[in-house]
Structures are given as C-alpha cells and as structure tokens.
Design a protein with these regions (language model features):
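Eukaryote-biased recognition of intrinsically disordered, low-complexity regulatory segments
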Residues: 6-16
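Catalytic alpha/large subunits of respiratory electron-transfer oxidoreductases
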Residues: 122, 126, 174, 181, ...
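Short, contiguous acidic and Ser/Thr-rich linear segments
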Residues: 19-26
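N-terminal leader/propeptide and maturation segments of large enzyme subunits in energy/redox metabolism
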Residues: 127-158, 488-546
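Short, structural beta-strand-to-alpha-helix junction motif
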Residues: 26-30, 349, 496
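Fe-S ferredoxin-like electron-transfer domains
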Residues: 3, 55-255, 259-263, 268-272
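A basic, amphipathic helix-loop patch mediating RNA/tRNA/ribosome contacts
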Residues: 28-61
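Short beta-alpha connecting loops at secondary-structure transitions
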Residues: 13-14, 99-105, 208-212, 462-465, ...
Length: 570
C-alpha cells in the first residue's frame, strides 16, 4: 500500500529528452533542477513567492495530446505518450508539472528567449563590473556570458538612475544595476513583515525605492543584499573591502545567540570580511539577523588580549605561557575546594566546558556555574538567550538553572568564604559581581579575549580565542548539536581555549593530555549521555538533534505553513 500511495504522488516528466519521476505539484524549475538541467533565473527564490517577472526562466513545454474516442495514442520507446509541443514558451518558476509533461531547456526557442531577455536587461545596465562588489558572484555577469548575444545592438543613450542611495543604516542602493527582480521587496514583506520597499515610475524608468518615512532598518535587512542577484544592493560593512574570489569560506555557526544560525565566514590573510547565512532548514532556513552577521567585529576590538599576563603592583606584566599556567594553578591550589569558585560561559564550546568540569573536579571547587545573559528576541530567528551553548552547559556541567548560583558566589565572596575565583569567557562585573565584591578575593584568574574591567582585577590573565578562531561543538536552543569551525588564527600569543584548559589540567594532575579536538570530543561523548556514539565528524555540516527542548523556530513554522499552502517551495 505505501508504494502505491507514493506512486500516486509522483508524475512522469520528460526533461530534455530524459524521463524522471517527480512529486506532483513540483514547479517546473525544481523538476529541471532534479534532472540536472539548469534553468537561469533572477526573480525566483525557493523561500519566496514566484512573481514570474524576470522571464529569464522561459522554457519550451509540451503535453500528450488528448485522444479522440477510439484513437490510439502513439508512444515512444519508453512507453510514454508522444508529446505535442506548445508554440510559445512558459515560465518554469510559477508553473507546476503534470503527468506526461515535456520540458525543453536547451531548445532553439528557449535559447532565443534567454538571449532576448538578457539583451533587454543589459540595455541600460552600467558597465560597473570592475568596481561592483557583486563581481564574481553576479548572476547577470554569469548569464550574460552563458546566455547573452555576445554583442550589443543598442546605440541610444542609456537611462540614468539614482546611484549610491542610502536606503537604510546598513545598505546602499544603485538603481542603475537593479534588474527589477523584486526579491528584496518580497523578502521584506513576506519574511520580516517590513513592507518598506517597492517600485515606482514606469517602463525603463522603473526604479526600486524605499518608503519616504521609513528606511530599510529591520534587523534582517542585510539578507536583501544576499539574495540580490546583481550589485544593486550592497552592504556598507563589506562595500569595497575585498574581492570575493580572494576570500576563503569556512562553514560554521553564529554565536550571537542560542539560535545557532548556520553561516559562512569569509576571510583572507587571517582577517574576516563578512559573514553570510548558510542554508539549514532545521535551524535558520536561508537567513540570519544583522546583529549576528556583524558579530565578527567583536574579534577586532582594539582592547584585544594577545599575551598572558600576571599582576605586578598596580599594573600587569607580560609573561610566557608556561609561567602563566604555573602561576594560575599554584595560586588556585593554595585554597581548599570550598574556597574556590569557577564561573564559565555558555558561550564556551562543549569541549571547553568538559575540560572546565574536569578542572573543577581536580580542584574540588565548591561551586561552578555559568553566566546567564538574556536580551530581546523576536518572532523570526533572534533568541532572547544571548549565549549560544546554554544547553551544552546544562548537559555537561549538569546545571538545572544556569546562572542561578552567581548571587550565591557573590555573597560568599563578600563573606570571605570564597577566596579564589576562576572566570572563563565572561566579564562578571557586567553580570552581577561588582568590583567592590571582587576586592575581597585573594586570587583571581580570568580568561577572555578582551582587556575589560575584570582583567584589571585579575592576578593572572589568560588570553583566549574567539568563536571564529577555534573548533568545537555547541547545542542550540532547540537541542541541535552543531560544529563550530576555525576560520582564522588567534592574534598574538593568545591560544585556543581548550588548549589552555588542557594545560591547566596537566599542571594540576600531571597526566598526558589529548592533542586533537576530535579525540577530546570522543572522550567527552563517552561521559555525557546525550552525546553517546557521536563523533565530531559525524555531526556533519547541518548538525544533529540530541536534546528535546520543546522549543521551535518561529520563522521555520511560518515557512512550513507557506509551503503547505503552496506559496513557496521552501
């Protein structure tokens, strides 16, 4: 029975002479994609509705003729009815397949249609390729080579349109480059409910514009730059910074909040130039928020810690790593377990949290917790939990309510019960433990990436690494285990945090430590139930669910509803 049902849901479609089976209701452009037949397009995007206004996806379409009573239908060698081809092309993005349908993407008619569309698009398009940020990833550039005529017949004066227009705090518009695909208009209206973009004027004078009283300022505005097929919309942050073909792309995850959006980090010569969303239909679809996109700037802070230091008088002195590790462990070892507290961060990777737990066991630390940081979330992707690995901290450190012990630690420091404190990855002065309280400590060790107010109080400073400077794993708000990958090296003498924690443990127990992060994950997986039988490589680029949190992603729920309604492909 299941096989029969599946067969009912499938239809036979011929694409460029080859028969394939596709799901009933599939759009022609997606059927061609399954058949590995490219159909060029500008306005079509699987996450948005299809207006069919660019006409670049025109293909030749045919259907079997309807037989007259008693007439025998002629069939081909495969047993399928012969196809009668329509004299006019159809758009592949907005039409769905039917049983016996034929599609030609490489016929003379289809090729002539594409050439004609390309010629119209290029009539008034400026020759900006040498200075355009989209060069190298511009579909107009690519299609003009693959589907264009090769020369222009246009001799008249090109229409001039507005250039370098500020339409929002993060975006510039060049109307001369716009091909009127309306992707940005539909994204703003359909995905983030911010209907501020539209077209005005007519014919060749048609231009994209923003509402006069409301700029494009929502927290997802830079997604319009990603989906713009040309260089009409550019990011102020990336504009004129680097050519795309010089950059290396690293698959990773955003650590700006607990959502864990999948991203591509684009870097060159140990510098990050941009972050863009990477599609994952279980986490962030194909989008990400602007604040997460700009999160990489936290790694460029002028007050970045680059060398280990110890306190000397009123200041700090740079030392080497072996001395720093020894000073930290000797200082902590002077106190009993009940006199030691450890505060970690829910921004640490699972591997780092595992080593922090090992360290706390070795020191017999009386109290261990992580800082809880909450802010504003929204009904799309941004999560109110502003730390990416709270679920990892719960599972590995066995915390029921992360952050609940911070006030207890503060009180016990004031009372003189806690005399030594190790703070990893957080500035606790901003999160509940004030400077006056810290003055009661006998010994303070901190590891951070920035020279903040906490570092000024510390006896030993251990410069760590940012999220793009290390490899590891995290568990997001919905319980999905994902991999964080290293895109650049930590600056100066700063090191990956798991290596620092390894050295602290080795200094205390004298045991040989693991040298590879993958081996560390395997050791952790043997001790953490939710990670059993997992390896770092088995997680893959899209992650795997390991915890049932009951949370859902609002944007994905809305997207699923639109897919069911047939509005988008998804």
């Amino acid at each position: 029975m299941p096989d029969n049902k599946n067969n009912i849901d499938l239809v036979n479609v011929q694409v460029d002479g080859h028969w394939i089976k596709v799901k009933k209701g599939t759009r022609m452009i997606e059927a061609c994609k399954q058949a590995e037949a490219e159909v060029p397009h500008y306005c079509y995007h699987p996450k948005l509705t299809s207006p069919g206004n660019c006409r670049m996806c025109l293909v030749e379409m045919g259907m079997p003729p309807r037989p007259a009573p008693g007439e025998v239908i002629e069939t081909d060698d495969d047993g399928h009815a012969n196809i009668s081809w329509m004299p006019r092309p159809v758009i592949a993005c907005a039409n769905t397949v039917a049983e016996g349908m034929g599609i030609r993407t490489q016929s003379t008619l289809a090729k002539e249609c594409r050439e004609g569309v390309m010629e119209f698009l290029l009539i008034n398009h400026p020759l900006d390729c040498p200075i355009c940020d989209q060069a190298g990833e511009c579909t107009l550039q690519e299609y003009s080579v693959e589907h264009g005529k090769g020369e222009s017949r246009f001799l008249e004066q090109k229409v001039k349109k507005p250039k370098n227009v500020k339409i929002g705090p993060r975006i510039r518009l060049d109307d001369e480059r716009c091909v009127l695909c309306s992707r940005c208009v539909r994204f703003s209206k359909e995905i983030v409910d911010d209907d501020v973009l539209g077209f005005v004027d007519r014919g060749s004078h048609n231009v994209l514009t923003v509402h006069p009283d409301k700029p494009l300022a929502n927290n997802y505005s830079l997604n319009t730059v990603d989906i713009c097929p040309v260089g009409a919309l550019t990011s102020n942050d990336f504009r004129f910074q680097m050519r795309v073909w010089f950059m290396r792309e690293t698959k990773s995850i955003c650590t700006g909040c607990a959502r864990g959006c999948n991203i591509l980090i684009s870097s060159r010569e140990n510098k990050i130039y941009r972050q863009t969303p990477r599609e994952n239909n279980e986490v962030n679809s194909a989008w990400m928020c602007d604040s997460g996109r700009m999160h990489y700037h936290t790694l460029e802070a002028k007050r970045r810690l680059t060398d280990p230091m110890i306190k000397r008088g009123k200041g700090h002195e740079v030392i080497d790593w072996p001395t720093a590790i020894l000073k930290a462990t000797k200082g902590l070892s002077k106190f009993s377990g009940e006199e030691i507290a450890i505060i970690g961060s829910a921004g640490m990777t699972n591997e780092e949290l595992f080593l922090l737990k090992t360290l706390s066991s070795t020191l017999n630390a009386g109290i261990v917790d992580v800082v809880k940081v909450e802010g504003e979330g929204d009904e799309y992707l941004s999560h109110k939990d502003k730390r990416p690995n709270t679920n990892g901290a719960k599972a590995i450190l066995k915390l029921r309510n992360p952050g609940s012990k911070i006030n207890t630690i503060k009180k016990r420091i004031k009372d003189g019960e806690i005399k030594a404190l190790l703070v990893y990855g957080e500035n606790v002065i901003k999160h509940g433990i004030d400077q006056e309280t810290l003055k009661n400590l006998k010994f303070l060790v901190c590891s951070h990436i920035q020279a903040n107010s906490l570092a000024e109080f510390s006896n030993v400073i251990l410069p760590g690494s940012g999220y793009a400077e290390k490899r590891g794993s995290m568990i997001n708000a919905t319980g999905r285990l994902q991999v964080l990958n290293k895109a650049i090296e930590p600056p100066g003498q700063s090191r990956e945090d798991w290596e620092i924690l390894q050295d602290l443990n080795r200094s205390l127990d004298g045991k040989d430590q693991i040298t590879e992060i993958a081996d560390l994950f395997s050791e952790m997986a043997n001790q953490v139930p939710i990670l059993k039988q997992k390896t770092l490589s088995s997680i893959g680029d899209l992650g795997v669910n390991v915890v049932e949190t009951g949370e859902t992603v609002p944007l994905l729920e809305r997207e699923a509803k639109r897919v069911r309604e047939g509005l988008i492909v998804g």
